[in-house]
A protein has these predicted regions:
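Serine-dependent protease modules
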Residues: 2-267, 275-276, 285
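Conserved PDZ fold ligand-binding element
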Residues: 77, 289-297
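Extended hydrophobic-aromatic, low-complexity segments
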Residues: 268-272, 290-293
Length: 297
């Protein structure tokens, strides 16, 4: 496939007032038209475990991603680690609704960043013609009060756009029930809802200045969304894209332990007084695990 997704965004000029301040931007249609092709929807199919009923079940989660590069074999998509965490299967949907299989390439759990790969051979030429590679901006140049635009797969319903301003810079957030705690974030009042994680936070030039990552959820709180600054992400992403893409291995070539299990979350450790590690939900008969004396539970 020779089609190249090399369109860059960021051609909208900003008006200067008194040579010092940007005018208030209310019409972002041209910025959005240019930027939407570089944002994708991500579906994560994973196995969840109900400790109360002692059973596994299939679950699906939705997020977003930003197309940041293309090489000879693949498109590279930046997203949050929590969007792809524990995935059995990943799927990416482009702006034209084409959906293809995706693979984890590199992850940085502590920084809540990940790079996902889509093989070019899996993407129809027609779809390649509709997508774009994002222009990355300079998050260090952001100022409180300037306009911001968030694009993402809100609630899993497909791409949507919200606007606001940069509310604060260098913010730290900590949630007691979350393993990931982030610092030096961008705060915006552009709505960031479930499914927006991994999507793009743009400036008025259409440049990606942040990766939408989280929102403080409380009935008394409005307009507090957070994004990882693109300048913070750059050196991490530079290393992640060098890693080998993790493709599925044929069943007959896989190592086989003989158990079904799931990681014990911090929430489960607290609620059920379980130790840290892997909870064994079943042991297959005749396997090495059974012979070693591993038991269910």
């Amino acid at each position: 496939k020779n089609s190249k997704a090399d369109i860059h965004i960021g051609n909208v000029e900003t008006i200067q007032q008194a040579d010092t301040a940007k005018a208030v931007v209310t019409d972002v249609t041209q910025v959005v038209k240019a930027a939407m092709p570089c944002v994708v929807s991500i579906t994560n199919e994973y196995t969840a475990y109900d400790y109360w009923y002692d059973e596994e079940y299939d679950e699906e989660a939705n997020g977003s991603g930003i197309i940041i590069a293309q090489n000879d074999e693949e498109l590279l998509i930046l997203t949050n680690y929590h969007v792809v965490e524990d995935a059995n299967d990943l799927y990416v949907q482009f702006i034209d609704d084409t959906e293809v299989v995706a693979y984890a390439k590199g992850v940085a759990p502590n920084e809540d960043l990940a790079v996902v790969s889509v093989l070019l051979e899996d993407v129809p030429n027609a779809a390649l013609d509709t997508i774009a590679i994002a222009a990355l901006g300079d998050s260090d140049a952001l100022e409180v009060g300037e306009p911001s635009i968030a694009i993402g797969n809100s609630l899993g319903y497909g791409q949507s756009v919200t606007t606001g301003v940069i509310s604060a810079l260098n913010c730290d957030i900590f949630e007691d029930d979350e393993e990931i705690n982030l610092s030096s974030l961008i705060q915006t009042d552009a709505a960031i809802n479930p499914g927006n994680s991994g999507g793009a936070l743009l400036n008025v030039n259409g440049e990606v200045v942040g990766i939408n990552s989280s929102k403080i959820a409380d009935y008394a709180i409005e307009g507090m969304g957070y994004a990882i600054p693109i300048n913070t992400a750059r050196p991490i992403v530079d290393e992640l894209v060098k890693q080998e893409t993790k493709r599925k291995v044929a069943v007959e070539k896989r190592a086989f332990l003989g158990i079904s299990g799931t990681d014990v979350s911090e929430d489960a450790m607290e609620k059920y007084e379980m130790p840290e590690g892997v909870y064994v939900s079943s042991v297959l008969s005749g396997t090495a695990a059974e012979k070693a004396g591993i038991k269910k539970g």
